[in-house]
């Protein structure tokens, strides 16, 4: 049983390396289960990559799953039945609790009927669950605050609502944030996970609930492989503070190594993938230079002309930015014979641009997909 970390710059081929490796291992050991665990939005693309790379385009003992899909796979195996409360249900229950506990609330009492307030409260409670902060731990934190501070009163109301919400769920429902807790308790009973191989790709870090699951899996899973985005010139164990470009990668490394040490899980020598001719940016020297030097302490100027590889435009509003991007896409489709699936529009605030996407892209007849979760609209 061993943990191995695969380090490399963005575009250096970490995914390619680990996909080729897991395909070879799966072909050599048909009786072992291999789980490639990726963020939810990458599952279909990863399946496609593995199928295309596999011999005869078939993967028999390799499953591509997210954490949540892995949980339901094991629940099906063990016959575990859980009624998962959806987002609309959470809002309804919190509304009911707010009505019942109204007299005990101080700050929230006057705001609870405002549009969107229940959703904000729901989001906060969901985040507390996701980061494994229990009602008791929140209560302990309250005792450390000054009783006359605004933060104390606000968190006191949140604590009241959180405790009542947990009490309502007890024995009846489980939230999406607690699905991994249920899975962690079932890991030892699963035959699918016994001596399996886990491959984690596309993660920048793990939440405490996910780490709790990994701790339990280290007792039953044969090997774990984790890809980490890190400049190979950097020391993965160095601590340069939160302002460091690769802070999250280093934090994930430290968390995994600490977990392996606590569970007596062997740590193999890491793999460092150099930036070479097969890297994603090899055909674009401008972008390759940018990747190597952007936000680095010791950066170098690109002495040649950037050509068409990099252009900076300034527009007045997000809508105008999106219209320009749509026009540029249409132009490249006609002039360069590119395909829509070869493009991505990356933005810092997806919600801000999402509200203009429908009208702009339909105007230019461009098919599109917005990478956000769409919840059912609450009626409360």
Regions found by a protein language model. Name each.
Residues 2-6, 14-17, 100-202, 208-209, ...:
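Accessory N-terminal region flanking or inserted into the helicase ATPase core
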Residues 2-3, 10-32, 40, 187-189, ...:
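Helicase P-loop NTPase motor core
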Residues 21, 50, 210-216, 356-360:
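A short acidic, amphipathic alpha-helical/loop segment
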Residues 31-140, 146:
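Conserved P-loop NTPase-based nucleic-acid remodeling module centered on helicase motor cores
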Residues 58-63, 365-374:
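Conserved RecA-like helicase motor-core motifs
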Residues 63-69, 197-206, 210, 225, ...:
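Conserved helicase core region in the C-terminal RecA-like lobe
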Residues 205-279:
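Extended, H/D-rich, highly charged conserved domains that either
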Residues 377-380:
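Conserved small/polar residues in nucleotide/adenosyl-binding loops
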